[in-house]
Amino acid sequence: MLGVSLGARLLRGVGGRRGQFGARGVSEGSAAMAAGESMAQRMVWVDLEMTGLDIEKDQIIEMACLITDSDLNILAEGPNLIIKQPDELLDSMSDWCKEHHGKSGLTKAVKESTVTLQQAEYEFLSFVRQQTPPGLCPLAGNSVHADKKFLDKHMPQFMKHLHYRIIDVSTVKELCRRWYPEDYEFAPKKAASHRALDDISESIKELQFYRNNIFKKKTDEKKRKIIENGETEKPVS
């Protein structure tokens, strides 16, 4: 009897530990899955400064990158690189580019830089690989469709890591300007420094404004109308 009792106790002990290990494994697996889903919701914010907008002849001279979560909280600040370009290209820029890039100090910084386009792509690709899963997170920015053209051409490996969709703040801006002009009047004004990192920060703040003052407000109004009409709010499918 003693042997059976001891054996039973031993089996129960092993089974209990297995149960604990199994529960821990499920818990850790769920946490990992939740973390993966959260990372998939991140946004890759990019801003470029170029020598112009002609995709056939102009080049990238500055690039910055920030990562936010879906609520627009900044999670990581990536490289902010000045990319070397030949003096002939800088000399052939439009008067607008010469004025603004000269005033901001960017033209001088480009002439002094030793960073190549290939080195820049490697740095940015390494950064986004650390912060986002492949193929799931969209490119975000202001008029970012223009940046995307240059990135597709000059940094294809970087772009392959991102989702094919984009989040363009300028689209939201133009819709709000037309649909909610009273609210749009209070949108944050851009300082127009024409430096990549400053422009990204301004774009994030601008989208935060639209989210907090227009998207949220309209959602709250809809909920109030549903309650006033005595309707049951339908769950989102």
Curated annotation (Swiss-Prot):
Protein localization: Mitochondrion intermembrane space; Mitochondrion matrix; Mitochondrion; Cytoplasm
GO annotation, biological process: nucleobase-containing compound metabolic process
Residues modified to N6-acetyllysine: K173
Active site (catalytic residues): H194
Record-annotated disulphide pairs: none
GO cellular component terms, A-Z: focal adhesion; mitochondrial intermembrane space; mitochondrial matrix; mitochondrion; nucleolus; nucleus
Segments forming domain Exonuclease: 43-207
Boundaries of the annotated transit peptide in chain numbering: 1-25
Gene3D superfamilies recorded: Ribonuclease H-like superfamily/Ribonuclease H
A GO molecular function held by the record: magnesium ion binding
Family: Belongs to the oligoribonuclease family.
Purpose of the protein: 3'-to-5'exoribonuclease that preferentially degrades DNA and RNA oligonucleotides composed of only two nucleotides. Binds and degrades longer oligonucleotides with a lower affinity. Plays dual roles in mitochondria, scavenging nanoRNAs (small RNA oligonucleotides of <5 nucleotides) that are produced by the degradosome and clearing short RNAs that are generated by RNA processing. Essential for correct initiation of mitochondrial transcription, degrading mitochondrial RNA dinucleotides to prevent RNA-primed transcription at non-canonical sites in the mitochondrial genome.
Name this protein carries in UniProt: Oligoribonuclease, mitochondrial
